[in-house]
Amino acid sequence: MPLLDPDTRSPAESSAAQPQRLPFPPVTYSHILHCSYHHWQPRYRTLTPKSRAIPLTPSFVSYLRADGIVLPPETTRPQGDDDLDTFSDDGADEESDPSVEWQEIHSQIKSTISEFGGKVTPKLNWSAPKDAVWMSATNDLQCRTPNDIYLLLKSSDFITHDLEHPFDGCVPDTDDSSEAPATQPDIPYHLVLRKYVNFNPSLEFRCFVRNRVLLCMCQRDQNHFDFLFSLRDTLRSRIQAFFDEKLKDTFPDPNFVFDVYIPEPHQRVWLIDINPWADRTDPLLFSWLEILQMKDPIGIKEEDADGPEESFVRLSLNGANPTVVEVNGDEDCESEEEDVGSADDGDDLPFLPEFRLVKRDDPEAYSFSTPQYSAHKLPREVVDASLSGPGGMSEFLGKWQDILAKQTQEDTDSDDGR
């Protein structure tokens, strides 16, 4: 998701002097690798949706890096004899089949698709090709064949970033025992195939952890969902308990960002992804400057989520006179900041991790008509030419140059006639 300008989301920040560089701690090579799916998923296997991670060979990685989109020929042929003449017998398809270099991976992909009921969603170590879903017939990450997967992977800028720039802005891990200049570690690339599930995007949330403290969280989808406000305290309690029990003391790094999905009846939390604590990770409804300057929550929550009424206790540390405020969890509060302030206007410290939702009147809400990742899209003519292989792209470029030359000539003739 494209990063938003912090000034557009935090007017209070725009009036203050902002540092030219966000005050992130150094992002190390190991932190990026710890956030790779192949590293963290085995540890949290029971917390994640069903998936398979297929180790990739250098030849397959080279295929993903190569220019153009050349797909293996489909192996399913028509049943009728009348259609057999549509297939060439001269071996041209076999010669242009890129999968001959990685037949084992091709076979694993096909068997995994079959194992997962015929539909999967793909990603590499860190990213899913969400910016390329416009290439899909279903306009989502649903893939039914290996070629569906290859098309998404090779059309995605996010995948290109995983392949070419995974350690941008990173520093080597400190090692006082070695004075040799550190080199970037090798990356064991994996193709992750997750069983396709039609997730409800309104129930996906991004959570930010600093120094092993759950700092804040927000919805991932940037549309307004009115029902979320009455569920906010319940969902926050679920996420906090999940973090405390499963992630707080088990993830290798103290700072990270994780995504969860909490489907109805909102009893179970699924771990979807773990992301680096770095500006490459989209802060969504926050700004990174806001998160980095945020104070740790100090509240203690006591909640019976299964009871008829939910409540929690806020401990307000205000000089020598601590106060206790009980808040009804059923209140439909659109602005959590206003709710906190009403409990104790003089308290500067947050009681609980802030849970930010898109408000009804938020200018970013109701973005159903705005195509997501539209900056990554290409004209259909370019896509069609790339699907035809190197020859198709060369032909397209030749036609494009002819069009430009003709346009230049017309402009010149028009100027001469004046």
Curated annotation (Swiss-Prot):
InterPro entries: CDC123 (IPR009772). It comes from Neosartorya fischeri (strain ATCC 1020 / DSM 3700 / CBS 544.65 / FGSC A1164 / JCM 1740 / NRRL 181 / WB 181) (Aspergillus fischerianus). Residues 81-98 have a biased composition (Acidic residues). Residues 1-23, 71-101 are annotated as: Disordered. Residues 1-10 have a biased composition (Basic and acidic residues). Transmembrane segments: none annotated. Mg(2+) binds at residues 273, 275. GO terms for biological process: eukaryotic translation initiation factor 2 complex assembly. It is found in: Cytoplasm. The gene is cdc123. ATP-dependent protein-folding chaperone for the eIF2 complex. Binds to the gamma subunit of the eIF2 complex which allows the subunit to assemble with the alpha and beta subunits. This is Translation initiation factor eIF2 assembly protein. Belongs to the CDC123 family. ATP binds at residues 123, 126, 128, 130, 194-195, 204, 206, 220, 259, 273, 275. GO terms for molecular function: ATP binding; magnesium ion binding; protein folding chaperone. One of its GO terms (cellular component) is cytoplasm.
